[in-house]
Amino acid sequence: MKRILTMLLALAMIFSVAACGKKSNDGANDKPVDVLTKVWETYKDDEKFAAGGGDANNMTMDGPGKYDVSDVEGLDAQLGFPQASVALIEDAASLVHMMNANTFTAGAYYVSDANEVELLVEDMKDNIMNRQWICGFPDTLIIVGLGDNTVVSAFGNAEIIDTFKTKLLSVYDGAKVLCEESLN
């Protein structure tokens, strides 16, 4: 009897260890600032550029920062997030090129209702594509979905956006490019 019990316990341990072995990372449980931070941390020193993030109250000078979703005008002016869609998100973060935001700007957003993601993507795309650019023109816009409720947008220099997209897709299993458009 002891032998059977020992064997059953050993099998249970083996299966529990195997179940913990590979965990999917689809971004479903990551906060927006964590999403951008995980991607930023994959950049090698020669790939990095002067970048900061966050809003005026959560500003960082060396990487992504939390963005207060109650700053409706700031979300629109700095990240291209449509003011009319702010009610759809609970949390946000940003990563922006410090010399020129049109060279690279990324925002990550947690969408309250997964059923609203498709509508939000269209609103974001329209808002960014219809902007009047003042200081240089970004080349490319991407919007990527992570899990059911997280959306990441980025616009800027085509090469920098391509690097960001590649890194984002490699960090998050199942991430999907929902929009990729030329802004020229």
Model-flagged regions — what are they?
Residues M1-I4, L8-L9:
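Positively charged n-region of N-terminal signal peptides that target proteins for export
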Residues G21-T105, V111-N184:
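Soluble, non-membrane globular domain cores that form compact, hydrophobic packing
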Residues F15-A19:
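C-terminal motif of bacterial Sec signal peptides marking the signal peptidase cleavage site
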